[in-house]
Curated annotation (Swiss-Prot):
GO terms for molecular function: rRNA binding; structural constituent of ribosome. Keywords: Ribonucleoprotein, Ribosomal protein, RNA-binding, rRNA-binding. GO terms for cellular component: small ribosomal subunit. With S4 and S5 plays an important role in translational accuracy. Located at the interface of the 30S and 50S subunits. Part of the 30S ribosomal subunit. This is Small ribosomal subunit protein uS12. Belongs to the universal ribosomal protein uS12 family. GO terms for biological process: translation. Gene3D superfamilies: Nucleic acid-binding proteins (2.40.50.140).
Length: 147
């Protein structure tokens, strides 16, 4: 008859505690939290939004079973120089964004900070172009400021 690996008894508390503490490191979520890996990998460095310069416009194909070209932009962040892809939400929103424009991006709202819906690998969306909200530009309530 095989015995239990766990110590039993009146004075086994410390041993159980140490064993549990060591076992936690086998769980990926604990490791990520303990070493704050999410913050280190995050291009926005924990901030809710970030400013950046548009490097280029890109069209990404939607994942199956959808068939579309999702309009996105490559943005170089000002704070650390990292490049990320951001989705341009709204009808013809890409027409209001030009290369070398300053944009503000935020998370797209996918599950646990990941991509949302059928847009592969895109974790961010454009919120503002220059001083104007992208939503207001699309609706026609604001006009883009000409330099």
């Amino acid at each position: 008859m095989a015995g239990s690996k766990s110590p039993k008894g009146e004075f086994a508390g410390r041993k159980l505690l140490l064993k549990r503490r060591a076992s936690r490191w086998h769980h990926y979520k604990y490791v990520n939290k303990a070493l704050s890996l999410k913050l280190k990998a995050d291009p926005l460095e924990g901030a809710p939004m970030g400013r950046g310069i548009v490097v280029e416009k890109v069209g990404l194909e939607a994942k199956q079973p959808n068939s579309a070209i999702r309009k996105c932009v490559r943005v170089q962040l000002i704070k650390n120089g990292r490049q990320v892809t951001a989705f341009a939400p709204g009808n013809h929103a890409i027409n209001f964004i030009d290369e070398h424009d300053e944009v503000v991006i935020e998370g797209i709202g996918g599950p646990s900070g990941q991509a949302k819906g059928d847009i592969p690998g895109v974790r961010y969306k454009v919120v503002m172009v220059g001083k104007n909200s992208i939503r207001e530009l699309v609706r026609g309530r604001q006009e883009k400021v000409k330099r």
